[in-house]
Amino acid sequence: MFFRNLTLFRFPTSLDFSQIDSILPNARLRPVGPLEMTSRGFISPFGREEQEVLNQRQGDFLWLTVGSEDKILPASVVNDLLTRKCSEIEEKKGHPPGGRERKRIKDDLIHELLPRAFVKNSRIDAMLDLRYGYVAVDTASRKAAETVISEIRDLLGSFPALPLNAEISIRSMLTSWIAGEPLPEHLNLGDECEMKDATEGGAIIKCQHQALRCEEIDKHLEVGKQVSKLALILDDHVSFVLGDDLVIRKLKFLDGMLDQLEHSDTDGIRAELDACFALMSAEIRRLFLLLEVPLKLSKANN
């Protein structure tokens, strides 16, 4: 259940979530209809089989999950059928169908195929820190994260969440860290980075599984390359790659945190998930607060 990526948003801490239990059932995921391409809504963080509990709240942390049902209708299948249909019409009439008729035929084909299309189920989890006013969505895709925020906005009626941004150049800060400037307390360099030329469309250098403070890296810095992604480690609890887009990728929880689970008194899958969420949310908060000051992360207006 541990998140693997974090796309972050800020929201005002003054927002009221006290009615979340009563309004979530109205936004529950419903099965995609026979003539629909997609359906989205909230499902239980504990799985689709759970019908009663549609969120998990632990103190200031709220866990929401958006589920999706998407019809799989490959464009190649539709286009092949469209070509055959148009060929049949051309044989009968002596000329191919025009653009408007071709579009109508394609729409009819999609309408015919949809009820028989396979359905793909997916989910995206989000953790809301109600005390510090940020959402961590478990995806590296900005578009997918915005979909989750949109669902929360529809649920609440109003949810003024904005993508996380910084008042400084993230590339400059990441570059300074790899060049030898002190990192924030508790953070250490990992073994991966991506470096880019300052000019648009310039060279991109990717380094993995190597020490980042070395002569090879120094040479790239000397010619003006800047760090766009940097692997970091928070104590021995969390490793991750921070990008200049402020998306956290390759999030991994390490033995320093996982050892706490082994010593926790949990009985059953549900209790284990509760314990995992409690530890994960605490570590994500610690990471967020650790980065907030040096990166001058944006705040939401209350």
Swiss-Prot record:
The keyword Cytoplasm applies. Pfam families: RdgC (PF04381). One of its GO terms (biological process) is DNA recombination. The keyword Flavoprotein does not apply. GO terms for molecular function: double-stranded DNA binding. It comes from the Bacteria. Belongs to the RdgC family. This is Recombination-associated protein RdgC. It comes from Xylella fastidiosa (strain M12).
